Structure formats: C-alpha cells, structure tokens
C-alpha cells in the first residue's frame, strides 16, 4: 500500500503528537527517503499555537521560552494562569521562591477577565473584560515606548520601570498579546528569561490545516 501510494503521488501522512526526539526525526527522514511523498504532521491536544507563533515572530524559532521567577521583584500577568498550565511549563517552584516573605518578596499583579488560580494568589487583581485586558496591555507597551494617557497603564509602567530587569510581563490568550509581552520583556531586559527554550511542543496550526486540506482534496 505504501509503495502504491508513493508511486501514484499520494500523500503518506505520519500523524503524531509532538515528539522532540532526534532519533524519531532520523527514522522519519529515512522513511521519507524511501517514500518521498511521506509527510510528518504534528497534532497536540493542547497545541500552544499562539505561544509558538509568537515565539516564531519575536525570536525566530518555534520554541517556548523558559522563565524563572525566583529572582524577580515584580510580575504582571495579562490573562496568563502561570501557576496552572501556562506555556507548557509550571512556574510554581520559582514563584514560591520569589514570594518568600521579606523585603525582596516579589509583587504580583494579575490582569484577567475570569478568576484563575494565579489571580487568586495575586497581591493586586485587576478584573477586566477580555478586550479591555488586551487594550491595557497595548497601553503598557505604548507607555514603555513613548507614552500613554491611560492612568492604570501609567501606574503599571511606573512599576515596571522602577524594577527594570527585575520585572517580567506574562501574557496569554492570543498571539498578539504574547508578542507584546515578549517585546516588553526585551525592553526591560527581564532577567526572568533564562535564555533556554522548551522544544517539546511542535504543533503548527497552518501545517495541520494543510493536512486537513489533503484529507478533503
């Protein structure tokens, strides 16, 4: 069946969850050498599409940045439930280290539309509609890059500038929001970025849609 499909030019699709294994990639490479019409398509139950697309746009590669909050003095989260399943990484351990009572205890501000585990632990929780959360994030970005007339954004910008590299902004929900958070953290030179990347998630929404078009073609 494989030889027949290959000879007739039909796609031979290997559908797999993210499998960041060099051995697996080599085996598929050998398989594709034998059957040139073979295609590898990745599908994950939790795809992290927006996170991966944002990383591709800002950093140039589809890999999730790894954070460490242990030495941060301020975290501002926009819809990011980072004590839950955020960015394919749990930040509970480094968050707990940063929240040890004392003069260096990290301040946590949560901007979100629905109560989350992370929001329940925040020093300050700012409840807003989803569209307003995104607007505030944009205003914070603007405030760090010229100015904003939004009072809440100005207050957050002042806090971020006061902490500088000891601050970090986390966002979730859309590619645009996550891109802005990355750009803000670059502006701050945030030390919460470890320089490491999580390569365990490889889902590509455009690639999966292409696979569906093959099925329907």
Regions found by a protein language model. Give the residues of each.
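Cofactor-pocket helix-loop regions in the catalytic cores of large enzyme subunits
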Residues: 1-217
């Amino acid at each position: 069946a494989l030889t027949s499909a290959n000879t007739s030019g039909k796609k031979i699709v290997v559908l797999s969850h993210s499998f960041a294994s060099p051995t697996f990639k080599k085996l598929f490479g050998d398989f594709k050498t034998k059957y040139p019409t073979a295609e590898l398509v990745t599908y994950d139950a939790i795809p992290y599409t927006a996170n991966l697309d944002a990383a591709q746009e800002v950093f140039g590669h589809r890999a999730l940045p790894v954070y460490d909050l242990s030495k941060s003095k301020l975290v501002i989260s926009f819809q990011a439930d980072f004590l839950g399943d955020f960015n394919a990484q749990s930040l509970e351990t480094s968050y707990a280290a940063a929240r040890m009572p004392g003069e260096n205890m990290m301040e946590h501000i949560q901007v979100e539309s629905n109560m989350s585990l992370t929001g329940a632990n925040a020093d300050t929780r700012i409840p807003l509609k989803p569209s307003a959360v995104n607007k505030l994030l944009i205003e914070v970005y603007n405030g760090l890059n010229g100015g904003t007339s939004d009072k809440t954004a100005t207050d957050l910008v002042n806090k971020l500038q006061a902490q500088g590299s000891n601050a970090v902004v986390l966002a979730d929900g859309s590619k645009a929001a996550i891109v802005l958070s990355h750009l803000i953290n670059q502006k701050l030179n945030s030390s919460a970025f470890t320089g490491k990347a999580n390569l365990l998630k490889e889902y590509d929404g455009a690639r999966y849609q292409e696979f569906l078009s093959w099925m329907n073609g």
